A protein has these predicted regions:
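Conserved ABC transporter NBD signature motif
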Residues: 79-89, 136-140
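ABC ATPase C-loop
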Residues: 174-175
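ABC-type ATPase nucleotide-binding domains, specifically the catalytic core motifs of the NBD
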Residues: 33, 72-75, 119-138, 146-148, ...
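ABC ATPase NBD Q-loop/coupling interface
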Residues: 72, 83-98, 243-245
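The feature captures the beta-strand-to-loop junction immediately N-terminal to the Walker
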Residues: 54-56
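Helix-to-loop junction immediately C-terminal to a conserved catalytic motif
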Residues: 69
Length: 265
């Protein structure tokens, strides 16, 4: 299946591994009122990678995603400082609807679907860009080919579907906007292990089609299994980063729980 990922200009400055990153976060800090939630977070994502961000509750993962998708720019008390770029465009000052236009979209925790609407109508919500509307009919058929179960239930309300099927709808909706980058937030939450395995197999398939993926996940085993690169967050900071082959499970576990000793970085 062709996911129809859009193309774009990359940065002129090489990043990790000497590659030109598609997504860069530099010196990102975030506050909710006086409470600081992120502390100078910096990392880059290369084109075509799956990067997994691991951390316990309260590590700052959700705030990171909110910052990357414009949600920290909505309220009066939440604010961010730093720089977020995708394909040469600044994201840190944009609201959510404008960020989607840059090719970045998200599959949110809890899926956030319209429960009374049909599968087809939920998918079409993702085709809200002018160029996407023109290819919506073709695109939705590609999504159905990718998720055959959705094709069988296209006219049924989402409320009648299982959690795994709803997760498929949420991923399909993200694909409808022709993304170059998809941010996945806690895909395993509330799902049976066998269903999660199927969902992550689909994430890898999406990635192989050319879509760059950033995966937020508490389940360390699954995050490592899908990732080309791993970031571990603790108390609003990135405390460990590297490829699964570079990092030992002991190091990752220690970083996750805050007991990692200095690695000499």
């Amino acid at each position: 299946m062709s996911i129809l990922a859009r193309k774009g200009n990359l940065f002129s400055k090489p990043g990790r591994g000497g590659q030109y990153p598609i997504l860069t976060v530099e010196g990102l800090s975030a506050w909710y009122g006086e409470l600081r939630a992120l502390f100078d977070v910096s990392f880059s994502v290369n084109p075509g990678e799956v990067v997994s961000v691991i951390g316990a509750n309260g590590a700052g993962k959700s705030t990171l995603l909110k910052a990357m998708t414009g949600m920290m720019n909505r309220g009066r008390t939440a604010r961010i400082e730093g720089r977020i770029e995708c394909q040469g465009r600044r994201l840190d000052k944009l609201r959510t609807e404008k960020i989607v236009e840059t090719g970045v979209t998200m599959v949110p925790e809890g899926r956030m679907l319209f429960q009374r609407m049909t599968v087809a109508d939920n998918l079409l919500v993702g085709a809200h860009l002018p160029h996407a509307r023109q290819v919506a009919a073709e695109k939705i058929e590609e999504v159905y080919a990718f998720f055959p179960r959705l094709a069988e239930r296209r006219n049924q309300p989402v409320s009648q579907m299982s959690g795994g099927e709803q997760q498929m709808v949420a991923i399909g909706r993200a694909l409808m906007s022709l993304p170059s980058v998809i941010l996945f937030d806690e895909l395993s939450l509330g799902l049976a292990p066998i269903v999660v395995d199927d969902i992550y197999a689909k994430v890898r398939e999406i990635n192989r089609s050319g879509v760059t993926c950033l995966v937020i996940e508490q389940d360390t085993r699954r995050a490592l299994a899908v990732a080309d690169h791993v970031l571990v967050m603790l108390e609003g900071r990135v405390v460990l980063d590297g490829s699964p082959s570079e990092l030992s499970r002991e190091e990752i576990t220690a970083a996750y729980f805050g007991t990692l000793k200095n690695r000499g970085h």
